[in-house]
Swiss-Prot record:
This is DNA ligase. It is an enzyme of class 6 (ligase). NAD(+) binds at D40, A41, E42, Y43, D44, S89, L90, E121, R144, E179, K295, K319. PANTHER family: CHROMOSOME TRANSMISSION FIDELITY FACTOR 18 (PTHR23389), DNA LIGASE (PTHR23389:SF9). The lineage of its organism: Bacteria, Pseudomonadati, Pseudomonadota, Alphaproteobacteria, Rickettsiales. Keywords: DNA damage, DNA repair, DNA replication, Ligase, Magnesium, Manganese, Metal-binding, NAD, Zinc. It comes from Rickettsia bellii (strain OSU 85-389). GO terms for molecular function: DNA ligase (NAD+) activity; metal ion binding. GO terms for cellular component: cytosol. PROSITE patterns: BRCT (PS50172), DNA_LIGASE_N1 (PS01055), DNA_LIGASE_N2 (PS01056). GO terms for biological process: DNA repair; DNA replication.
Length: 689
């Protein structure tokens, strides 16, 4: 990652675009597919780099910035549930200095003279949920989703053995929030069952819990050893408690499971002592934790602190450092991806790290292998922090044997044997044989049918491989004629190994259903290099319809300067992406495929709906000293209500809130005839909204 201090504005703009797309992909994999692509540590590093860039260049903040989003958008297979109170995620801190900064911000924001108690509790590594009770009866269970809309998992949540379906002495409306998880021993047993049944093993307990809870068939969920803790309230008709410690006691009284390991800290020293205690003893806990959550204990103070776009100001998560292990590197294999990129993968002597057996690790790229001087036969250090593919962080040179061998990058593609070329700006080696490369063609079809693209359920990795091997499909277009081909064949698909009448029938129904596709999904399904989910929405919004999109792409391919500039001006599309788009539409086979697909698909025009709040778009200015509010708290409240807070008064200003010694801004507001109110009127306005 580049040095943030030395980066210039143009470099920052490009990097922010790349980060937005990459983080969006990682969010979807983690929150929706329950298959994380990177470690927690790597994700946190990317997210914090994005934050630092935005702090340095605030005018470059993108509309699709990760700092504005929570989780990922929900899938269509579950009914949607709107969270009346958004389910925000927590910001992260990584060392004592970060924690001290967090505590200082609380003091400054609230103008406190002394330390306000902080409640500390373990950060369970599971799946967040919300459960709503009406008159004591459980009516709705939902996932976090994107923080605003989650998935309805009511039937599944009811299968958890000790989850209350009814609570006594409850308010008319109560929404509790917490974490669903699987204990370490249960996870080991579950993976043994998966292996015995010939199914894929779960990467870690968090993935197992998430995958279990998001089953379409509740009877499958019922067989999984799910447990839960509640730790927060979403909404209630009456106040249950005045503080976090009181709330947990109330939850316990109502019959919910709460984590008994928690501490009310009255000083920084007590906070750090509790963190060290949990870090040292987490291996003895029956469940996985990945840090400690710190919350301002007093709810009245929490309300004053409020929220930023994706997280509360009054709480944060102090993450544990990654777990390190050591094992032998047996070999290095090479994988060819959808866009031709070759990725080296370390094959390892199996080792248990944090309760998970690890036998493979990512090596990222060949430059990384050379930089770390990783050799086959070495004993390597592994880092794992809840990720599906751990990372090699270094080599134990003291254990290096004389026969440890360096790994030379291949000169020819292991799939199609075509000559490879090095792409220095991306630090990668690539095969440019496109659809003529079996590995790329396979991965491209896999991408085309994936959840975020055409979403054809029943075409997983094994099924796609089978259909290609049998010559039933050779490109995405063939999928839509699979039923006709099967009907004309002497050997029916349902009679082949791994298939049955019902699975084939469901597959054909899903293929038919996928023919109605939105423009963003269609563009994403094409698999254009560097063009992710967020970018396709920008393109779809710009062009509106498939016909216009294709017409504009033809102009772009012909180097039309007007369309090139129009796309380059889009907030989220960079030069590198434009080159990749041009390269894609310059390939004859791609144009033919798109034309063929357009004849069998109904590609729907792009439609966007935006929700407006009562103050959305209003420009307000605070000036002078407020009697009770800090400037930060006043600004936060305004932004929470949808207003934009400006630093100066202009003819575009809608409202000025003036305190003592307001000065020139107040004078200008009077001259322009802008509405002016004081702090008391502002607080009344806020309360009424």
């Amino acid at each position: 990652m580049q040095n943030i201090e030395k980066i210039n504005e143009e470099e920052a703009k490009k990097l922010l675009i790349e980060l937005a797309d990459k983080i969006a992909q990682y969010n979807h994999a983690y929150y929706i597919e329950d298959k994380p692509l990177v470690s927690d540590a790597e994700y946190d590093q990317l997210f914090n780099t994005n934050l630092k860039l935005e702090q340095k260049f605030p005018h470059l903040i993108l509309e699709n910035s990760p700092s504005k989003k929570i989780g990922a958008k929900v899938e269509n297979k579950f009914a949607k549930v709107t969270h009346q109170v958004p389910m925000l995620s927590l910001s992260n801190v990584f060392d004592e200095e970060d924690v001290k900064d967090f505590l200082d911000r609380i003091k400054s924001f609230l103008r406190l003279d002394q330390f306000s108690p902080i409640f500390c509790e373990p950060k369970i590594d599971g799946l967040s949920f919300a459960a709503t009770y009406k008159n004591g009866i459980l009516t709705t269970g939902a996932t976090r989703g994107d923080g605003y809309i989650g998935e309805d998992i009511t039937a599944n949540i009811k299968t958890i053995k000790d989850f209350p379906h009814k609570i006594n002495n409850a308010p008319e409306l109560l929404e509790v929030r917490g974490e669903i998880y699987i204990e370490k021993n249960d996870f080991t047993s579950l993976n043994q069952e998966q292996e015995q049944q010939g199914k894929d093993k779960f990467a870690n307990p968090r993935n197992a819990a998430a995958g279990s809870l998001r089953q379409l068939d509740p009877s499958v969920t019922a067989k999984r050893p799910l447990k839960y803790f509640v730790y927060a309230i979403g909404s209630a008709k009456e106040e249950l408690a005045n503080s976090q410690d009181q709330l947990l006691a109330k939850f316990k009284e109502l019959g919910f499971n709460v984590n008994e390991i928690g501490k009310l800290a009255n000083s920084e020293e007590e906070i750090f002592s509790f963190y060290e205690y949990l870090k040292t003893n987490r291996k003895n806990l029956p469940y996985e934790i990945d840090g400690v959550v710190y919350k301002l204990n007093d709810f009245a103070l929490q309300d004053r602190m409020g929220f930023i776009a994706r997280s509360p100001r009054f709480a944060t998560a102090h993450k544990f450092p990654a777990i390190i292990g050591q094992t032998k590197l047996l070999s290095i294999t090479v994988q060819v991806g959808r866009t031709g990129t070759l990725t080296p993968v370390a094959e390892l002597e199996p080792i248990e790290i944090g309760g998970v057996i690890v036998s493979r690790a990512t090596l990222h790229n060949y430059q990384e292998i050379a930089r770390k001087d990783v050799r086959v036969g070495d004993y390597v250090f592994l880092q794992r922090a809840g990720d599906v593919i751990p990372q090699i962080t270094g080599v134990d040179l003291a254990k290096r044997s004389a026969d440890a061998t360096t790994f030379d990058p291949p000169l020819f593609c292991p799939s199609c044997n075509s000559k490879l070329h090095y792409v220095p700006e991306d630090i990668i080696i690539r095969c440019d044989n496109g659809l003529n490369c079996p590995a790329q063609n396979y991965e491209r079809i896999r991408h085309f049918v994936s959840k975020n693209a055409m979403d054809i359920e029943g075409l997983g990795r094994k099924q796609v491989e089978f259909l290609i091997d049998k010559g039933l499909i050779s490109n995405p277009y063939d999928i839509f004629f699979l039923k006709e081909k099967n009907e004309a064949s002497l050997t029916k698909l349902e009679n082949m190994d791994g298939w049955g009448k019902k699975s084939v029938e469901n597959l054909f129904n899903n293929i038919e259903k996928s023919k109605n596709v939105s423009l963003p999904r269609f563009i994403y399904a094409l698999g254009i290099r560097h063009i992710g989910e967020q970018n396709v929405k920008l393109l779809a919004r710009e062009f509106g319809s498939y016909e216009n999109f294709i017409a504009q792409m033809e102009l772009l391919k012909e180097n039309d300067p007007e369309i090139y500039q129009k796309l380059n001006n889009l907030d989220g599309i960079g030069d590198k992406m434009l080159v990749d788009i041009i390269d894609f539409f310059d390939v004859k086979e791609n144009i033919e495929l798109i034309k063929n697909l357009s004849e069998v698909l109904n590609i729907e025009d792009y439609k966007e709906t935006r929700e407006q709040s009562s103050l959305t778009g209003k420009i307000v200015v605070f000036t002078g000293s407020m009697p009770t509010l800090s400037r930060a708290e006043a600004k936060a409240t305004a932004e929470k209500l949808g207003a934009k807070v400006a630093a100066s008064v202009s003819s575009n200003t809608d409202l000025v809130i003036a305190g003592e010694d307001a000065g020139s801004k107040l004078k200008k507001a009077k001259e322009l005839g802008i509405k002016i109110i004081d702090e008391a009127e502002w607080l009344t306005l806020v309360r009424d909204i």
